[in-house]
């Protein structure tokens, strides 16, 4: 199976990279963190049901998968997984889905 990134997921990865690069003053550290997250996209594409179901607290059909301090929010689709968001685990994830 394949994976695709929604615009919000792409923006989240960029935000994570810039934040880590600024705080650590190291592009290498930022690259490693983002690479560790994007590596999980391939895992999720091959094992799409590995993540925690979030039907009750977020929306039906959504799943989440932790990667260190971050959480990948995704949906399983017929042709793979759609990565919707990549956010810090401490963030109010439910707020992303409130009207």
Give the positions of each predicted feature.
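Σ70-family region 2.3-2.4 aromatic/basic alpha-helix that recognizes the −10 promoter
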Residues: 38
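Short, solvent-exposed helix-to-loop capping segments enriched in aromatics
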Residues: 41-50
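Arg/Lys-rich, positively charged N-terminal/basic patches that mediate binding to nucleic acids
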Residues: 1-35
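Basic/aromatic recognition patch in beta-strand/loop cores that engages polyanionic ligands
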Residues: 49-79
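Enriched for short, Lys/Arg-rich terminal
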Residues: 67-71, 75-99
């Amino acid at each position: 199976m394949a994976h695709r990134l929604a615009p919000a997921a792409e923006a989240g990865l960029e935000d994570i990279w810039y934040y880590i690069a600024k705080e650590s003053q190291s592009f290498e550290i930022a690259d490693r963190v983002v690479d560790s997250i994007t590596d999980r996209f391939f895992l999720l594409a091959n094992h799409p049901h590995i993540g925690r179901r979030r039907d009750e607290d977020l929306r039906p059909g959504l799943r989440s998968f932790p990667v260190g301090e971050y959480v990948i929010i995704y949906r399983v689709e017929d042709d793979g997984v759609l990565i919707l968001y990549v956010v810090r685990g401490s963030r109010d994830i439910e707020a992303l889905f409130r009207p």
